[in-house]
Design a protein with these regions (language model features):
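A short beta-loop-alpha structural element at the N-terminal edge
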Residues: 1-8, 152-169
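Active-site rim helix/loop that mediates acceptor-substrate recognition in acyltransferases
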Residues: 10-14, 19-48, 55-61, 181-209, ...
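Conserved beta-strand in the GNAT
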Residues: 43-45, 51-60, 70, 75, ...
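A conserved beta-turn-beta hairpin within the catalytic core of GNAT-like acetyltransferases
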Residues: 61-71, 81, 223-236, 246, ...
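Acyl-donor-binding surface of acyltransferase catalytic domains
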Residues: 62, 77-151, 296-303
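Conserved acetyl-CoA-binding loop-helix of GNAT-fold acetyltransferases
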Residues: 76, 82-95, 122, 238-241, ...
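Active-site/acyl-donor-binding loops of N-acyltransferases
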Residues: 123-142, 256-260, 265-304
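Extended hydrophobic-aromatic, low-complexity segments
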Residues: 178-179, 208, 215-217, 225-230, ...
Length: 304
């Protein structure tokens, strides 16, 4: 696969998603390929007049019981749109995932891309959920909003195997009911902790109640994104709380701890993303803390 070409087209096509697009380089592409879950098949480059103008990555989820495929990196450089390139890339991706035995295909787009929405609907994709990019100014973080003060927070120790295994177990338990979640292996969890593709400064925290570990969250700083956007922003990662312990202020406690951690690192803002079909209603938690929606994305699904 021609990684330099892939990087060039991605950067040219994704500039419209400036709220989250940080750019990518060849070295980062190679790091992404080291992930145990990376699928090396299904990557296609579209050319017009021998010039690369578009991409698509037809990813077959290895651990999905539903045999679900995803259309990733589906993009065309703006000046080459409306010339049939997106239609051809979509056709190639769908056929690739059919060939690999997938029963369901998902693809996403920004709300402002009415042309992409129309294309997906013409291909019998149906809207299944929205994703929200949310942001908060760290000078406005509240307190006494229902956080559980009996919860003890402790950091994950990256060099302790037991902590990695605890995180893996918690992640799979907490996210079992979340749509699109596929169980993580120990290797995938270890790789995300030790070799995250862009959060070079990352911390993960466990929440314990009555000496039992019941939840976790993570925070990180993407230095490349901050330089590109000229901001001082951190990110709240996944927040997971075991089902029997939800609605007890533990998630609120974890979010507030994460925000205070980022503020202590001199960040001014924090970002998080979540979906409207999350059964834990995480978006309500973030709104309670003070996050505001920056941008929305639409995920469509096609059953084969």
């Amino acid at each position: 696969m021609d990684e330099p070409v892939w990087v060039e087209v991605l950067d040219a096509a994704y500039k419209e998603y400036e709220s989250w697009w940080r750019g990518i380089n060849v070295e980062e592409m190679h790091e992404r390929e080291k992930s145990p879950s990376f699928d090396f098949e299904g990557r296609f480059i579209a050319e017009l007049d021998e010039k690369p103008v578009g991409l698509v990555y037809a990813h077959a989820e290895k651990l999905s019981e539903e045999k679900k495929g995803f259309i990733y990196d589906f993009c065309v450089i703006p000046e080459f749109r409306d010339r049939g390139v997106e239609e051809k890339l979509a056709e190639v991706a769908i056929n690739e995932l059919k060939k690999r035995g997938m029963n369901v295909i998902q693809s996403w787009t920004g709300c402002e891309r009415s042309d992409r929405v129309q294309l997906l609907e013409e291909l019998d994709f149906k809207l299944v959920y929205k994703t929200f990019d949310m942001e908060i100014n760290l000078s406005n973080v509240p307190s006494n909003i229902g956080e559980n003060t009996q919860v003890t927070i402790s950091p994950l120790r990256k060099n302790v195997e037991e902590d990695i295994r605890t995180l893996n177990w918690l992640t799979n338990e907490c996210y079992e009911e979340i749509p699109n979640y596929s169980p993580r292996t120990i290797e995938e969890t270890r790789n995300s902790v030790l070799n995250h593709s862009h959060l070079k400064e990352q911390e993960i925290f466990f929440a314990a109640l009555d000496q039992k570990t019941v939840g976790y969250t993570g925070v990180g700083i993407d230095e490349k994104y901050n330089i590109k956007q000229n901001v001082k922003s951190g990110r709240i990662g996944r927040i997971g709380v075991l089902k029997p312990y939800r609605r007890k202020g533990i998630g609120t406690r974890l979010v507030l701890h994460g925000l205070k951690t980022l503020e202590a690192k001199s960040m001014i803002k924090a970002m998080v993303d979540t979906e409207d079909n999350n059964p834990t209603k995480a978006v309500k938690l973030y709104e309670k803390v003070g996050f505001k929606v920056l941008q929305e994305y639409l995920t469509f699904e096609k059953r084969l």
